Amino acid sequence: EKGLSACGFSGEKHVLLMMGGSLGAVKLNDCLREILPELTKTFDIIHLCGKGNLDEALQNRTDYKQFEYVSEGLNDLFAAADFVVSRAGSNSISEFLALKKPSLLIPLSARASRGDQILNAASFEKQGFARVLDEDEMTAETMKKEIFALYENKEKYVVAMEKSPAGDGVAAVMTQIKALMR
């Protein structure tokens, strides 16, 4: 698989993809890096950390691959990931739903945004597609707890996404085309 190969991963461990948004997210990056030794016992980690947020001390690890930003090949990284930790922007979470990727969503707080990510995350949580962690309550320890809870229950989230008509864009488009042909 291209994503695994691009990261130098063997495919023997589950893969966690961490995305902090287009500019990264310092608090998310810091928490993830603090618990990295514990997480990498179980997971290989792809970390999209944002421009200027690479940690040079972590560059040559075989179980952790960091990128400032990815445009070419992002689809391969999504394909390689078993689950995702991310902000809750509408484009990203729509991708997670379409690809059936269980996610831990950490929306921007109301102080830092219009509140749309909070609503997006709440909707996904209510539908059983994701777990949500409030950034104001997030510590490295709560992030670790939530990541492992997501991992241990990932099938539950996949089943919920598979049952959702919102997750099957092709079927929705075909239904519309057939309706127009009548």
Regions flagged by a language model, labelled:
Residues 74-114:
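A donor-sugar binding/catalytic signature common to diverse glycosyltransferases
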Residues 4-86, 118-120, 133-141:
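Donor-nucleotide binding loops and adjacent catalytic segments primarily
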Residues 147-155, 177-182:
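Short, hydrophobic alpha-helical segments
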Residues 22-24, 108-112, 163-164:
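Short histidine/acidic/glycine/proline-rich micro-motifs that form metal-
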Residues 5, 155-167:
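A short, well-ordered alpha-helix in the C-terminal region of glycosyltransferases
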Residues 166-182:
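C-terminal alpha-helical cap of glycosyltransferases
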